Amino acid sequence: MATVKKVLPRRLVGLATLRAVSTSSVGTFPKQVKIVEVGPRDGLQNEKNIVPTPVKIKLIDMLSEAGLPVVEATSFVSPKWVPQMADHAEVLKGIQKFPGVNYPVLTPNFKGFQAAVAAGAKEVAIFGAASELFTKKNINCSIDESLQRFDEILKAARAAGISVRGYVSCVLGCPYEGKISPAKVAEVTKKLYSMGCYEISLGDTIGVGTPGAMKDMLSAVLQEVPVTALAVHCHDTYGQALANTLTALQMGVSVMDSSVAGLGGCPYAQGASGNLATEDLVYMLAGLGIHTGVNLQKLLEAGAFICQALNRRTNSKVAQATCKL
């Protein structure tokens, strides 16, 4: 297993405390934000070389140690489609279960849901999309048909007391359709919420969104679904992830998805690399005086560990500025 080198300068300790400067506008933001760390699943699923199971387990444990309240651990998808996630059961069983930390797993179908439950999953996630063409190309059915396929999962989850999180892809743009109507995003989000998803993450899958587009989309969705049930999942393909996240914060959204070291993208959307780096998100939120419960120093150590294991450079600007990776 790769080992962590001591690459984090101690001067970062003072930086990481980020004595938040209060501003007159802070009152417009939530006082606390829940960060959903998607690196171990969304971040690693597209890596060409198979990441050893012990490395995945250590990464998840380090992220938990850093104080992240939610760490999406893996995906119970067919190894034929995503070979990187073939060790899903071993990962879920092998990680330390930190008190107060949730470890949701992606379940694309009922077979995956059953396997996840057998491995000890307490929360699962399902995926929808706001683009008909994206849905057709990925799973060869319509949006409505795709949601109907999840009905069995939601019913079984309800009976077993398992929480279900929903994802909506392509909320600000599609690689095939282009611009997506905010009304369509609102429609799909409302359906997932009415089906029983306690939280719906709105994903800018190809990272084309701007703050204006984010505002328009959320304005439509908030007419159908309470803000407490929403999260945003921004990609930094065009360098807009933090700006879009800030816009969502201003509109009351208090759950943010991000990936350590900015790992990951979407395997079906060409050029859609670059999830929002968790390190950069934590740095911004700390500067706004918004509580996350995340220790930036330990988070940076987790990012350094996985980047060294993958033999790659971090995509986090904060890590680049302080760790020299």
Curated annotation (Swiss-Prot):
The record's section on SUPFAM superfamilies has:
Aldolase (SSF51569)
Say yes or no: keyword Ribosomal protein present: no
Q: Which residues bind substrate?
A: 41
What's in the keyword line of the UniProt record? Acetylation, Disulfide bond, Lipid metabolism, Lyase, Metal-binding, Mitochondrion, Peroxisome, Transit peptide
The pathway entry for this protein reads as:
Metabolic intermediate metabolism; (S)-3-hydroxy-3-methylglutaryl-CoA degradation; acetoacetate from (S)-3-hydroxy-3-methylglutaryl-CoA: step 1/1
Motif annotated as Microbody targeting signal, chain positions: 323-325
Domain Pyruvate carboxyltransferase: from-to ranges:
33-300
Cellular compartments annotated: Mitochondrion matrix; Peroxisome
Q: What is its main location?
A: mitochondrion
Which terms in the Gene Ontology molecular function aspect does this entry carry?
A: hydroxymethylglutaryl-CoA lyase activity; magnesium ion binding; manganese ion binding; metal ion binding; structural molecule activity
Where does the record place the modification N6-succinyllysine? 48, 137, 179
Q: Which reaction does it catalyse?
A: (3S)-3-hydroxy-3-methylglutaryl-CoA = acetoacetate + acetyl-CoA
Q: Give the highest taxon in the source lineage.
A: Eukaryota
Instruction: Please give an example of a GO cellular component term from this record.
Output: mitochondrial matrix
Question: Which of the residues bear the PTM N6-acetyllysine?
Answer: 48, 111, 137, 179, 324
Which E.C. number(s) belong to this protein?
A: 4.1.3.4
Q: Which residues form the active site?
A: 266
Instruction: Tell me the GO BP annotations in alphabetical order.
Output: ketone body biosynthetic process; L-leucine catabolic process; mitochondrion organization
Range of the transit peptide: 1-27
Pfam families, A to Z: HMGL-like
Instruction: Share what the entry says about its subunit structure, partners included.
Output: Homodimer; disulfide-linked. Can also form homotetramers.
Q: Which NCBIfam families match?
A: PRK05692.1 (NF004283)
Protein family per UniProt:
Belongs to the HMG-CoA lyase family.
**Role played:** Mitochondrial 3-hydroxy-3-methylglutaryl-CoA lyase that catalyzes a cation-dependent cleavage of (S)-3-hydroxy-3-methylglutaryl-CoA into acetyl-CoA and acetoacetate, a key step in ketogenesis. Terminal step in leucine catabolism. Ketone bodies (beta-hydroxybutyrate, acetoacetate and acetone) are essential as an alternative source of energy to glucose, as lipid precursors and as regulators of metabolism.
What protein name applies here?
Hydroxymethylglutaryl-CoA lyase, mitochondrial
Q: Taxonomic lineage per UniProt?
A: Eukaryota, Metazoa, Chordata, Craniata, Vertebrata
